[in-house]
Structure formats: C-alpha cells, structure tokens
Amino acid sequence: MDIPRIHTISESAHRIHNPFTPEKLATLGAALRMHPGTCVLDLGCGSGEMLCTWARDFGITGTGIDMSPLFTEQAKVRAEELGVADQVTFIHGDAAGYVAEEKVGVAACVGATWIGGGVAGTIELLARSLDPGGIILIGEPYWRQLPPTEEAARACLAGAIADFLLLPELLASFGHLGYDVVEMVLADQDSWDRYEAAKWLTMRRWLEENPDDDMAKEVRANLSSEPVRYATYTREYLGWGVFALMKQ
C-alpha cells in the first residue's frame, strides 16, 4: 500500500505535505485552543509534522494514519526527534474508513479529502471518531479566482472548474452540511511556494543520484515543466486552507 511514487520522490524532503509553513501550522494549533491531553486523529497524516509539533507545543496526544510507508517512517523518526514518541502513534494504512477506537477531541483530514470521496463524505467519516463538542479539521483547496477556462483549471491539476469552490462558497457549504466554521488558517503564495518549489531541488538531487531509475524520465519531465506551470496557474488561481468545524 503506497501513494504514487512521483509524490514520494518529489516530497521526500518535505515535513509538511501541504502549502503550509511551520508558522501557519503553529498558528492553527494555537487558534484551536486545545488543552494539554487533547486527543487528535489525523487521517492522511503525511510525515506527521502536525501531530508531532502540536504534541511538543500544546501537549496533545494523537494518532496519524497514512498510506505512504516512507512518510509513516519519517513521522516516527520526527516523533523521536521532538521527544514526543510517547504521545503520538503513526500507523501505515488506508485512512479511508478509519474510525478511532476511542472518541477524540479533534478529528482532522488536512489535504486528503479523497479518502471520504470528497468534503462531505470526509466530514461524515471524521464525525464518527469525534467527541460531542469536538472539532473537525478539513484541509481543502478553493479557487482564489475562477480560472478563465477548463484548460486552465486542469493546469491547476484540478479535473474541472467545478471540482473546487470560491472561498465564500466553500465556507457556505460547511453550513449546508450542518457545521459552524469556528476557525480557519489559509495558505498564501509564500506558503504555496514552500510546498511546490521545494519539490524542484528534491527532484534535481534525486535525478543526480538515480539517473537510470525507471522514474527518471517522468521526474525530469516534471522538473522541466513544473516551475512554469505552477507560477502560471496554481500560484495565481488556487487557494488552500484548513477549516475548523463544529456541529451546529
């Protein structure tokens, strides 16, 4: 069980697999006003930076699930580095359908809502693990401005313009699902750069070390095209944020 290899190559040096900086992750943690001992479930946890740093900074405990063996191992190493291995647990597995054995105070899916077939299904899944009065965290893209054409939307790596909403529409959609939006922290172009541009040096170094790998041609093509594609489309049109929700 793994995610596509191009992602584990291009993001192998990432600690945060979303367009967030460490500062934004810390801002989100502080905004949630979690008490020490709050239990957090993170579905699609990547390399575990959210759980590990929040365990260090806010005293939370938690469990993270991710499909990538590489990222799961990185998460365990990071927990040891930060001295929080006794507070957080990381499991290599499919987060789709995962429900915690004991209810949690915060249930999160930050940038992987495909596990529930979209935002609504992911919220429904997370709610099954949540304490009454708990908080759901959803990380999701939105359009900063509507792409002018469907081709431009696809160049943002969306399937179509209809895949994402404008920010006011996305916020309204949570209300339609019966949830109050109680906090949000949004990516900006600088944090997008840290997510996307960091891939380029990683790919270049990987190519130098693996010139004969079966993936070398695809990685080279990505390295050649991604900077211009990203600057032209994703950076201009696509937003991303983490939204804190509570049942109405």
For every predicted segment, state its role.
Residues 141-161:
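Short, glycine-/aromatic-enriched active-site segment of Class I SAM-dependent methyltransferases
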Residues 18-36:
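Conserved alpha-helix/loop element of class I SAM-dependent methyltransferases that forms part
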Residues 97-107:
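A short acidic, Gly/Pro-enriched loop at the edge of an enzyme's catalytic core
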Residues 38-46:
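Conserved class I S-adenosyl-L-methionine
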Residues 120-135:
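A short glycine-rich, Lys/Arg-flanked "PGG" loop and its adjoining helix->strand segment in the class I
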Residues 49-96:
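Class I SAM-dependent methyltransferase SAM/SAH-binding core
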Residues 105-119:
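A short SAM/SAH-binding and catalytic strip from SAM-dependent methyltransferases
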Residues 183-248:
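Conserved Class I S-adenosyl-L-methionine
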